[in-house]
UniProtKB/Swiss-Prot annotation:
Heterodimer of a B chain and an A chain linked by two disulfide bonds. Insulin decreases blood glucose concentration. It increases cell permeability to monosaccharides, amino acids and fatty acids. It accelerates glycolysis, the pentose phosphate cycle, and glycogen synthesis in liver. This is Insulin. It comes from Oncorhynchus keta (Chum salmon). The gene is ins. One of its GO terms (molecular function) is hormone activity. The keyword Disulfide bond applies. Keywords: Carbohydrate metabolism, Cleavage on pair of basic residues, Disulfide bond, Glucose metabolism, Hormone, Secreted, Signal.
Length: 105
C-alpha cells in the first residue's frame, strides 16, 4: 500500500511540475531511484547488480601506493573509467524514463 502511495505521489509531482514533460531528465538516487524503477518496470521487475565495494581492497595497497594516491588524485575519476551502471546513469547524472526502462526485465 505504501509503495502505491509513493508511486502516486511521484506521478503527481511529475504531472504538476511546470514546463516539465514525463521524459524530463532527473537525478534519482537511493530509494527514489528504486521507487522510480518499480513504477516504470511494474510487474516485470528490474535488473540491478550493485558494484563491489572497493574499500576492503584498499588495505591490500602498500603504504607507498596509498600515499601516491593521496598526492596525485585524479582530476576526474570518471575520465579514467567508463561506468554504465544505473547509479552512474541516474544518480550522478540526470536520466529520463526511457533510461529507466533499459533496466526493466
Amino acid at each position: 500500500m505504501a509503495f502505491w502511495l509513493q508511486a502516486a505521489s511521484l506521478l503527481v509531482l511529475l504531472a504538476l511540475s511546470p514546463g516539465v514533460d514525463a521524459a524530463a531528465a532527473q537525478h534519482l538516487c537511493g530509494s527514489h531511484l528504486v521507487d522510480a524503477l518499480y513504477l516504470v518496470c511494474g510487474e516485470k521487475g528490474f535488473f540491478y547488480t550493485p558494484k563491489r565495494d572497493v574499500d576492503p581492497l584498499i588495505g591490500f595497497l602498500s603504504p607507498k601506493s596509498a600515499k601516491e594516491n593521496e598526492e596525485y588524485p585524479f582530476k576526474d575519476q570518471t575520465e579514467m573509467m567508463v561506468k554504465r551502471g544505473i547509479v552512474e546513469q541516474c544518480c550522478h547524472k540526470p536520466c529520463n524514463i526511457f533510461d529507466l526502462q533499459n533496466y526493466c526485465n
